[in-house]
C-alpha cells in the first residue's frame, strides 16, 4: 500500500503537550489496516453477482501526539477501519473497486474531523461466471476453458464462478481534506502475454559491448504492469474503462487474430498502447506502463546434427533472469499527476 506522500509543516510537540521545534521532526506519517478480505454477494433474483476484494485503508491524522507523546485519543483503531470495510459493504453494496475505495475514503474524512488524508488500496479477485460448456459431461476433448468472448448470457451460470487470474485489477484512492480533487489511480498487474512471430529488434547500437545479433523474427513475451490516473471521476465507468485498457494492450500486442501485427520493438508496442488509451478514454489524464522482456532463446542444435539435423525454430529455453525492462509514461499536456 502506497503511503500518503504529502508532508506536514507542523512543528514537533514536546512531551508536555506544547509544540516546540526539535532537532528532528516527523515529515510523513500514517497508519492503517492492510489485507482486509471481503466477499460481497448481490442476490437479485436467481442471478447472483460477486465481488471479492483485498482492501487496505491508511489514515493520516493532523496530530502527531500518538508518536510524540504516546497519546492514542485521536487514533481510529485499525480494527475499526477493518470493521468499516464490512459495514459499508453491507450498507451500500459494491459496484467497482474504485467506487468502493472512494466511498471508504470519503467516509473516514466525513466521520473523523481530525483525519487529514485517507488512502484506500483495493485489489480485485478475478472471478468469472462458469459457462455452459464447463458444466457438461467431461467427454469433450480440450483444455476445459470457456471462450467468454463468444458466448451469450444464456450460457452463463447464475451462481457458480471460476477463478481466472489473467490479470489483477487494482486501484488507489487518495482523498485529502485540503484538496478538492480526489486522486483515483487504477491499474493492471501481471498481464502475461506471448506471441511466437511478428516481433523484431534490429539496427540498434553496434559497438564493442554488443553481442546480440539483429533479430528479424523472435518470440515476444512480457508481463504488463500498467496504471493510469483519472482527471474526471464523475463520468467514467471504472469497470468498463479497465476492460478497455486491457483490450487495447492485447490488441496492440497481438493484432488481428489471423494476421497479427508487427512489433519493431517493445518500446513501440508500449507507446501505441498508451496513446490509444488516451485517445479512447478522455477521462484518463496520464498512463504509465512497464513491459519486462521475458526472453526465450533458441536451443542450439548445431552440436547435435546427427540426432536432429537442420535448423531449430521449435524448441526454446525460457530465461527469466536477467531480463530487459521497458517503461514509459504518457500524459496529456499541462496536467499534473500523482503517478
From Swiss-Prot:
Pathway: Purine metabolism; urate degradation; (S)-allantoin from urate: step 1/3
Keywords: Oxidoreductase, Peroxisome, Purine metabolism
The EC number(s) this enzyme carries: 1.7.3.3
S-S bonds: none
Cellular location(s): Peroxisome
GO cellular component: peroxisome
Entry annotation: catalytic residues: 33, 78, 295
Principal EC category: oxidoreductase
Reactions it catalyzes: urate + O2 + H2O = 5-hydroxyisourate + H2O2
Any Pfam family: Uricase
A GO MF label: urate oxidase activity
Gene Ontology BP terms: purine nucleobase catabolic process; urate catabolic process
Function, as annotated: Catalyzes the oxidation of uric acid to 5-hydroxyisourate, which is further processed to form (S)-allantoin.
Record-stated family: Belongs to the uricase family.
Protein name: Uricase
Source organism of this protein record: Drosophila subobscura (Fruit fly)
Amino acid at each position: 500500500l502506497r503511503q500518503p506522500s504529502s508532508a506536514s509543516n507542523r512543528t514537533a510537540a514536546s512531551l508536555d503537550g506544547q509544540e516546540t521545534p526539535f532537532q528532528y521532526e516527523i515529515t510523513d506519517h500514517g497508519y492503517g489496516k492492510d489485507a482486509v478480505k471481503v466477499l460481497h454477494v448481490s442476490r437479485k433474483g436467481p442471478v447472483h453477482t460477486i465481488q471479492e476484494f483485498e482492501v487496505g485503508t491508511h489514515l493520516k491524522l493532523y496530530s502527531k501526539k500518538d508518536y510524540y507523546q504516546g497519546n492514542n485519543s485521536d487514533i481510529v483503531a485499525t480494527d475499526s477501519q477493518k470493521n468499516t470495510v464490512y459495514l459499508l459493504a453491507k450498507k451500500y453494496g459494491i459496484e467497482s473497486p474504485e467506487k468502493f475505495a472512494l466511498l471508504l475514503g470519503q467516509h473516514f474524512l466525513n466521520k473523523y474531523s481530525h483525519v487529514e488524508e485517507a488512502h484506500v488500496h483495493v485489489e480485485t479477485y478475478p472471478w468469472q461466471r462458469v459457462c455452459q460448456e464447463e458444466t457438461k459431461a467431461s467427454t469433450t476433448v480440450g483444455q476445459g476453458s470457456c471462450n467468454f468472448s463468444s458466448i451469450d448470457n444464456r450460457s452463463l451460470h447464475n451462481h457458480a464462478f471460476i477463478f481466472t487470474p489473467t490479470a489483477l485489477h487494482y486501484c488507489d484512492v487518495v482523498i485529502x481534506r485540503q484538496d478538492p480533487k480526489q486522486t483515483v489511480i487504477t491499474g493492471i498487474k501481471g498481464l502475461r502475454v506471448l506471441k511466437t512471430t511478428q516481433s523484431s529488434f534490429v539496427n540498434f547500437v553496434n559497438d564493442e559491448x554488443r553481442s546480440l545479433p539483429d533479430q528479424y523474427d523472435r518470440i515476444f513475451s512480457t508481463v504488463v504492469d500498467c496504471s493510469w490516473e483519472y482527471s474526471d471521476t464523475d463520468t467514467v465507468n471504472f469497470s468498463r474503462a479497465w476492460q478497455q485498457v486491457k483490450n487495447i494492450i492485447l490488441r496492440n500486442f497481438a493484432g488481428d487474430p489471423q494476421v497479427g501485427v508487427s512489433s519493431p520493438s517493445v518500446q513501440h508496442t508500449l507507446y501505441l498502447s498508451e496513446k490509444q488509451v488516451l485517445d479512447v478514454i478522455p477521462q484518463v489524464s496520464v498512463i504509465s506502463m512497464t513491459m519486462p522482456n521475458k526472453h526465450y532463446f533458441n536451443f542450439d542444435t548445431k552440436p547435435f546434427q546427427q540426432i536432429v539435423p537442420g535448423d531449430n525454430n521449435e524448441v526454446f529455453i525460457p530465461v527469466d533472469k536477467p531480463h530487459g525492462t521497458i517503461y514509459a509514461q504518457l500524459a496529456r499536456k499541462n496536467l499534473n499527476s500523482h503517478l
